[in-house]
Curated annotation (Swiss-Prot):
UniProt similarity note: Belongs to the bacterial ribosomal protein bL19 family.
One GO MF term attached to the UniProt entry: structural constituent of ribosome
Protein encoded by which gene: rplS
This protein's name: Large ribosomal subunit protein bL19
Function: This protein is located at the 30S-50S ribosomal subunit interface and may play a role in the structure and function of the aminoacyl-tRNA binding site.
Domain of life of the native organism: Bacteria
Entry keywords, A to Z: Ribonucleoprotein, Ribosomal protein
SUPFAM superfamilies per the UniProt record, alphabetical: Translation proteins SH3-like domain
One GO BP: translation
Xref: InterPro entries: Ribosomal_bL19 (IPR001857), Ribosomal_bL19_CS (IPR018257), Ribosomal_bL19_sf (IPR038657), Translation_prot_SH3-like_sf (IPR008991)
Amino acid sequence: MNTLDFLDKKSLRDDIPEFRPGDTLNVNVKVIEGSKERVQVFKGVVIRRQGGGVRETFTVRKVSFGVGVERTFPVHSPTLASIEVLTRGDVRRAKLYYLRELRGKKAKIKEKR
């Protein structure tokens, strides 16, 4: 193991649940406004997960007031308060970019049994 891997291993979080593209998550993000800190919930479907180690990121997509919103989070970021897996999705792709073009019921992902 080289020096960078050793440094990366110290800053990895161990409280991250197992999740994959297609899963629906509640991502609790710490937001600092002035002197106050609060937790903001971002609920959506994971459309991709990429990278490894400290640089690993995932993108969550939701539709808010008819507008698609995507947000990319670093997995091991200290600004993430917690991640909750709500449902497991049954998909056959690693990157779900095709959901950007789908509307209504077609954009729904089957739940894994």
